[in-house]
């Protein structure tokens, strides 16, 4: 219950929160951080009441990857680094959508049951895609497991995210 209370104090009911996960456990899986601002522009154009929440894990490497995204999206909720796993799961469960790299956070988002869009480059979506009926993935063009994630276009991600939003209903 305390984790849900913490989550509700950060991500309140009625907000249209889209979670972004710009980090991963190795840099080859990290979609370029500069892509999140144009992605957010596309999402916000279609959903003007939306607000971003940036999720990342503990440690300086995670924070360093998240900082440019937080700086580019000044109204973003900083939902990373200092929360327990159960608090993070409770916050994710209050979001309308998760868009992020192939990472533990992506799998945690899918496990909470929210619509989840995984971004793939050199990791294999056939093995590591998020699971669940509301989960989708997009991959950089090229061979599975070898394509650089930087080749994944913003418009491809935006289209997939908007489609997933249109196909699903808000939970809170």
Where are these regions (language model features)?
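Donor-binding and catalytic core of enzymes assembling or modifying cell-surface/extracellular glycoconjugates
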Residues: 34-123
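Short beta-strands and strand-loop turn motifs
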Residues: 19-24, 53-55, 139
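Residue-level signal for inorganic ion chemistry
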Residues: 20, 36, 157
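Mid-sequence helix-capping/hinge segment at a functional interface
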Residues: 1-29, 33
């Amino acid at each position: 219950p305390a984790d849900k209370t913490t989550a509700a104090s950060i991500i309140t009911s009625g907000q249209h929160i889209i979670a972004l996960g710009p980090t991963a456990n190795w840099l080859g899986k990290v979609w370029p951080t500069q892509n999140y601002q144009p992605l957010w522009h596309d999402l916000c154009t279609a959903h003007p009441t939306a607000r971003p929440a940036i999720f990342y894990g503990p440690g300086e490497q995670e924070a360093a990857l998240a900082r440019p995204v937080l700086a580019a999206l000044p109204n973003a909720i900083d939902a990373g680094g200092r929360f327990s796993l159960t608090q993070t799961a409770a916050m994710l469960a209050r979001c309308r959508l998760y868009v992020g790299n192939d990472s533990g956070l992506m799998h945690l988002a899918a496990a909470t049951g929210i619509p989840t869009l995984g971004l793939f480059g050199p990791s294999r979506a056939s093995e590591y895609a998020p699971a669940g009926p509301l989960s989708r993935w997009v991959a950089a063009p090229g061979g599975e497991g070898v394509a650089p994630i930087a080749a994944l276009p913003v418009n491809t991600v935006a289209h997939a995210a908007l489609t997933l939003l249109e196909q699903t209903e808000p939970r809170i």
